Amino acid sequence: AWTMRDAGCHVFMYFGEGDAVEKQLITHALDSEQEQGRNMLPEITAWSRAKRLKVMNPGLGRSGEADCIAVYGLMEMASYPRLIGGTYGYRSDQDGCLISSGLAMELFGGLDVAGKYIWCRQKPYKIRGVTDDSSHVILLPAKDKDAMRYMMFTYARSGEGRTGEEGTSHGMETGKAAAVNFLYRNEIKSGKVLVDGAYVSAAAGLGVCIPLWITSV
């Protein structure tokens, strides 16, 4: 999971239900920017949360319900509880998932579940890791048509990498503007709620609440 030490290079956006952005639009935007030769492209992780989806342990025949977080990008960016077993998997992994300790206990009776399979959204997924969360949650790779309501842009810190087209580094001070401009260029409406990590990291009290807010709204 991400830490507050890294908050300064992140920009968080929340999209209302009617303004959520399909995963395929995000991938198309990144491809388009790369084709145009733009420097300092952001690393984007986006996700949405659906409550009480059916999940099943196909081996034991146990079933239950869990909140499903569909993720485009890095699982660790969309998960605030720490990892207690296994790994987060790779960005390109479309067959792996992450589950909470509470769900592991409910369906498998233990936490040593990395490598086992769980069924959700009409597909079996191989469990890559387990998070320290007593509630029932599963994180899966997003599908093309999944509407993302939360988006995190990660830019290089100030002084790292090349400078952008305007001659400034996309670091803490320019993260918000860079994210908004990225969406504007690709005809994607900006999120209703916008939090610039440069300011969040300076306010520890607010910063601690951010991971809870972005995964529970």
Regions found by a protein language model. Name each.
Residues I26-G37, L103, L107, S169, ...:
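Hydrophobic, Leu/Ile/Phe/Ala-enriched alpha-helical segments that form helix-helix packing faces
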Residues H10-Y14, E43-A50, E65-A70, L98, ...:
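Ordered hydrophobic segments in well-structured contexts
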Residues R62-Y72, L83-K143:
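Hydrophobic secondary-structure segments that place a key small or acidic residue at a functional site
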Residues R5-C9, R121-V208, L212:
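Small-residue transmembrane helix packing/gating motifs
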Residues W2-K54:
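Membrane-proximal extracellular/periplasmic loop immediately following the first transmembrane helix
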Residues K51-P58, K116-C120:
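Short acidic-hydrophobic surface loop/beta-edge motif
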